[in-house]
């Protein structure tokens, strides 16, 4: 018979293992977010992020592809070295796969910035409901601990700055061929681009369901000039910026 302490250690180790597995990235797709954040979703549909997969199709963005020494007639939607920066969660649990492509993941959507939603979405919804019914606020840490990303600069850098000679220390193969040396328009500065609503989406007033840290560094600035959500949109039941 195993020593009681050894047995206890084994049980605790297994618990930690399965708890970690339960919180591993699990993507659900943008439709889950847009069911509450209708205004943000509507605005996002007009951005290049929403059309990211389209640019991988044959005959699209010919001039840009030629400049980057790519074949403009090739179908890059099947190329694993390209797809990762055009979809949600490629190569991660629950994320987009080439073999079984899911439309709600086939773009750079909500979860590419805000993190895979399965583990935190329920708590996020409950926070909105608690605020709506009782005026009770929820600490952001509750959803941050379950995977919601409030500081997503690295997620952006992983695609926009992932090239040879990049100033970003995390750059590694497969590199993007779309670099500032190919065209200056590929120069990427997070603090500038995150404020470009044409690149991201319009910001809308949030009802204050969440409080405390971690808080996105431009949260207050964005909220100060945010638009009022369209009538019928549920303000307090989706992602916080």
Please report, for each region that a protein language model flagged, where it lies by residue:
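Short, low-complexity polar/charged micro-motifs in intrinsically disordered terminal tails
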Residues: 14-15, 237
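Secondary-shell segments that build the walls of catalytic and ion/ligand-binding clefts
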Residues: 176-179
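A conserved mid-domain beta-alpha-beta active-site/ligand-binding segment of alpha/beta enzyme cores
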Residues: 156-159
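Sec/Tat signal peptide C-region and signal peptidase I cleavage site
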Residues: 5, 15-24
